[in-house]
């Protein structure tokens, strides 16, 4: 009797377990929902031709810097007075005024169209390719426009003889009338005339200064000889 009762209990238990396994399994209350599977990332796009050209230009510039053919860009704040010590403060101010005059967009840059208008007003109009070539020659950050530093670099290269005589940048530098009255040069029409006259004035001043120093040395030598002669004469009287 006991064995039959035990067998019935086992049979009911097996049926209950089978029913639980075959039915839908509900998530317990309060259990966190399963996280959604992340979607696969789209494949990376192949580099475009413009990206290849930009990378090539950057590598080319790095080679120029390593070989000393180009100035490395500085991360610090640009200071024209320390970076271009050959220019006086007045000259830099005049060049800055000229830069702002043609910076019609007031964004701190002279773009292609603004450079086109500048060259037309200076009486040396350039073709579209000529304008792009002008910018490219001093465009150190490859942004296709001129910053104030790159604008000053034009005059630095011109003064150092690094520009072609028939280039657009040379025409810009020659035709830019800069007030250099406080450079110690009166009546100079442009930067190059000012540099020549400034060098002449400096040479003349150095010559006058050297002549004064030589005259002072000669007078001191004559005074020393007179004192020596007086001491000798005095010694003769005492003997």
UniProtKB/Swiss-Prot annotation:
Stretches for region Disordered: 1-53
Record localization: Mitochondrion inner membrane
A GO molecular-function descriptor: calcium ion binding
EF-hand domain: residues covered: 90-125, 126-161
Superkingdom: Eukaryota
UniProt keyword Metal-binding, yes or no: yes
Annotated positions binding Ca(2+) 1: 103, 107, 114
A Pfam family hit: EF-hand_7
One GO CC annotation: mitochondrial inner membrane
Modified residue annotations for Phosphoserine: 201
Annotated binding of Ca(2+) 2, by residue: 139, 141, 143, 145, 150
Keyword Lipoprotein among UniProt keywords: no
PANTHER family, sorted: EF-HAND DOMAIN-CONTAINING PROTEIN D, EF-HAND DOMAIN-CONTAINING PROTEIN D1
Function: Acts as a calcium sensor for mitochondrial flash (mitoflash) activation, an event characterized by stochastic bursts of superoxide production. May play a role in neuronal differentiation.
The name this protein goes by in its record: EF-hand domain-containing protein D1
Organism: Homo sapiens (Human)
């Amino acid at each position: 009797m006991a064995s039959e009762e035990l067998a019935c209990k086992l049979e009911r238990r097996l049926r209950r377990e089978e029913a639980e396994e075959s039915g839908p399994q509900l998530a317990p209350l309060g259990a966190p929902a399963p996280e959604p599977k992340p979607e696969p990332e789209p494949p990376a796009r192949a580099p475009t031709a413009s990206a290849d050209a930009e990378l090539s230009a950057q590598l080319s510039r790095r080679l120029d810097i390593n070989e000393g053919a180009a100035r490395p860009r500085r991360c610090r704040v640009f200071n024209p007075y320390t970076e271009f010590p050959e220019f006086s403060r007045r000259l830099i101010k005049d060049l800055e005024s000229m830069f702002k005059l043609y910076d019609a967009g007031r964004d701190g840059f002279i773009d292609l169209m603004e450079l086109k208008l500048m060259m037309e007003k200076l009486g040396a109009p350039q073709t579209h390719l000529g304008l792009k070539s002008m910018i490219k020659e001093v465009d150190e950050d490859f942004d296709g426009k001129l910053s104030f530093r790159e604008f000053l670099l034009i005059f630095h290269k011109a003064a150092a003889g690094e520009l072609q005589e028939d280039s657009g940048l040379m025409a810009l530098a020659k035709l830019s009338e800069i007030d250099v009255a406080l450079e110690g040069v009166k009546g100079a029409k442009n930067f190059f005339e000012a540099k020549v006259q400034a060098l002449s004035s400096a040479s003349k001043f150095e010559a006058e200064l050297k002549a004064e120093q030589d005259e002072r040395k000669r007078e001191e030598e004559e005074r020393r000889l007179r004192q020596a002669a007086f001491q000798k004469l005095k010694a003769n009287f005492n003997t």
